[in-house]
Amino acid sequence: MTAAVTSSNIVLETHESGIKPYFEQKIQETELKIRSKTENVRRLEAQRNALNDKVRFIKDELRLLQEPGSYVGEVIKIVSDKKVLVKVQPEGKYIVDVAKDINVKDLKASQRVCLRSDSYMLHKVLENKADPLVSLMMVEKVPDSTYDMVGGLTKQIKEIKEVIELPVKHPELFESLGIAQPKGVILYGPPGTGKTLLARAVAHHTDCKFIRVSGAELVQKYIGEGSRMVRELFVMAREHAPSIIFMDEIDSIGSTRVEGSGGGDSEVQRTMLELLNQLDGFETSKNIKIIMATNRLDILDPALLRPGRIDRKIEFPPPSVAARAEILRIHSRKMNLTRGINLRKVAEKMNGCSGADVKGVCTEAGMYALRERRIHVTQEDFELAVGKVMNKNQETAISVAKLFK
């Protein structure tokens, strides 16, 4: 009896041990199928959503194609809560109604809008298009130049602060005095005297959008392109106010107009006329300031330099001995100098040099130290650098004297 029970238990255990792995395997296979089906369903749902988006896009395109065409206009002025003055090219200016779904308070001057072809009702607001070349003129990262990095220009820094920085930071002072804010300033002087460096420092301290453009970039091949770029430049400045427009080498488009000029000169004159129009048009309360720089003030058109357009002219003369010594201290303060270097003596030997030449002397002095495998700069390195930068024979004379020491 006991033997029979034992044999039956063995058969049952063997049966269970064979069934359990079988069902476990089936469960795993079923779970894999479920996961596969679930992933397939998700993939099909994603495809369905993508196709639905395409269908909606095509329906919108079809609806737009079936609608009557619209005129593109430019907002000039808001007349009332339901009326807007719009300019349409080439027809003219119209006072039009505004659709109910558009808030008139959101409209701004120079904004592009759509007008219905039948009723001239304003029914859509468009984004202002900008030339990629004009968009690239905006400097996204404000220069890290400060007034401490500008040497020998104490008077010029004070004057440009009064014209550019003070109206931006404290406009209430001009309102209390009852005077108009200055619109712009022109910096003139020989090359390398610090005009661009000071403009970068102003952009850093005023915390404004800095738009830098060279006058040569506004000289275009086709008729009207330069004028259009000037208009878009000031539109971009108004959109990102407060902003500073720095126009370098303004003499390339602002030279004096002469009779009988044609071809490329006439296009340059049209560009300058558009610039004059924009300088007269934009309001000083918009916190848009313009800085111009040139090496040739004598050839600029008097209409560009009159008060009301350019309110101050700041001269950048060649630096004096004291100014050159200060510039040397600024550019050499991070250099590894030996003791006893007399920068004043170095500055006295650089008659007629500009600030850029002084910076070049510091660089050349470091190069002379590298040639002799030294990690410090000596007085003699500066004297050799002065001779090289000033293009004189001092380098040869000093080298010969060094041999007989």
Curated annotation (Swiss-Prot):
A cellular component term (GO) from this record? proteasome storage granule
GO MF term set: ATP binding; ATP hydrolysis activity; proteasome-activating activity; protein domain specific binding; ubiquitin protein ligase binding
Per UniProt, where does ATP bind? G189, P190, P191, G192, T193, G194, K195, T196
Location, primary (coarse class): cytoplasm
Compartment(s): Cytoplasm; Nucleus
Keywords per UniProt: Acetylation, ATP-binding, Cytoplasm, Nucleotide-binding, Nucleus, Proteasome
Instruction: Name the PANTHER family on file.
Output: 26S PROTEASOME REGULATORY SUBUNIT
* Function, as annotated: The 26S proteasome is involved in the ATP-dependent degradation of ubiquitinated proteins. The regulatory (or ATPase) complex confers ATP dependency and substrate specificity to the 26S complex.
Give the family from UniProt. Belongs to the AAA ATPase family.
**Protein name (database record):** 26S proteasome regulatory subunit 8 homolog
Gene behind this protein = RPT6
